[in-house]
Amino acid sequence: MKFYLVGGAVRDMLLGITPKDKDWVVVGATEDEMLANGFIKIAANFPVFIHPQTKQEYALARSEKKTASGYHGFEVNFSKYITLEDDLKRRDLTINSIAIDQNNKVIDPFNGQADLQNRILRHTSIAFIEDPLRVVRLARFKAQLSNFNFSIAQEMLALIKELVKTGELNHLTRERLHIEFVKALNNPKIFFTTLKELEALKIIFPNISCFLPLIPNKSFFENPIYKGSNINEKITLCLLKIPQQQLDDIRKEFLLTNKHYKLLKASIAISKILEDRSITAEEIFQLIKNANIIRDKNLFAESLNLYKKYLKICDTITPHRNYQLLQTTINTIKNASIDSLTIKTIPKDKLRNTLKQLKL
């Protein structure tokens, strides 16, 4: 059996990036032989193994044949007679179809190194269009590698636009799209605009297609403050200007977790309260209550700090109200034990006056 380093790790190394993970392909081996050599199988129906010492992933070389719609519709062959080139040929892009053998020799049957040097994203074979997920992965790679300014090969653009017309993208699951979105958080604006260029955005993320101008520009995501944020924060910073009434649709579209949703909802409420000149005292009260930032002090602190972070990155927005007064207002509402009542039923006491001050 022979072992080859493959895929993203090789691509990143050739670009001068330290790879986060290393994946290996094994040629000339069977599942039983892998187990006999101490490898640990990690998938019941798929011959992928963990190395007993390095804990890195090793997969048997395979070929694929399209048999049905969607990205699950493939017949996979793991025969020990599958060659390295067979395995590399099934991969999506030439830059991901490069291998390094145990003697550190680069094996590049599809000229991926030339495409790396020329910053071109190109399909390895016509089989690219057999898997609709690869359209989303292409946009994600463009976002992930945004520092290198890759462009998409013209012949590939034409190929993808034909694929979009077939309806294959409708078979993608929200779970898989969520994973790709999170991986694209390096620069989601590039991710979305690339999908739009591929005529796929309206199909995959129809709500974002309507609100694409509200996603910050590319330079926003290149800011060190954004880059140093965690995933929850990046999702909120990306979607902060989406209208409050669209949040439930956005939540379904991206399959956001409860934590993502609560932080996003609270941050959008704070943004609207502090920036909107025309908002009424009643609307302020409802936003504060509905965002659950009265009861949850940690949520309020986290979302307010995140909004401040957004302002630092933008460096062009000046809130019309101050943070301290917002905190005072929330404390006043909490102490008044208001729940189902609206502000219109509240006498002109400290609560109403504080809300009116905040409105001003």
Curated annotation (Swiss-Prot):
Keyword annotations of the record: ATP-binding, Magnesium, Metal-binding, Nucleotide-binding, Nucleotidyltransferase, RNA repair, RNA-binding, Transferase, tRNA processing
Any matching Pfam family: PolyA_pol_RNAbd
Other facts noted in the record for this chain: A single active site specifically recognizes both ATP and CTP and is responsible for their addition.
Reactions accelerated catalytically: a tRNA precursor + 2 CTP + ATP = a tRNA with a 3' CCA end + 3 diphosphate; a tRNA with a 3' CCA end + 2 CTP + ATP = a tRNA with a 3' CCACCA end + 3 diphosphate
EC number assigned by the record: 2.7.7.72
Chain sites annotated for binding ATP: G8, R11, R91, R137, R140
Cofactor names: Mg(2+)
Keyword Nucleotide-binding on entry: yes
Keyword Nucleotide-binding: yes
Functional description taken from the UniProt entry: Catalyzes the addition and repair of the essential 3'-terminal CCA sequence in tRNAs without using a nucleic acid template. Adds these three nucleotides in the order of C, C, and A to the tRNA nucleotide-73, using CTP and ATP as substrates and producing inorganic pyrophosphate. tRNA 3'-terminal CCA addition is required both for tRNA processing and repair. Also involved in tRNA surveillance by mediating tandem CCA addition to generate a CCACCA at the 3' terminus of unstable tRNAs. While stable tRNAs receive only 3'-terminal CCA, unstable tRNAs are marked with CCACCA and rapidly degraded.
GO molecular function: ATP binding; CCA tRNA nucleotidyltransferase activity; magnesium ion binding; tRNA binding
Residues given in the record as CTP binding sites: G8, R11, R91, R137, R140
Any one Gene Ontology BP term: RNA repair
Family statement: Belongs to the tRNA nucleotidyltransferase/poly(A) polymerase family. Bacterial CCA-adding enzyme type 2 subfamily.
SUPFAM superfamilies (UniProt xref): Nucleotidyltransferase, Poly A polymerase C-terminal region-like
Domain of life: Bacteria
Sites where the protein binds Mg(2+): D21, D23
Protein name: CCA-adding enzyme
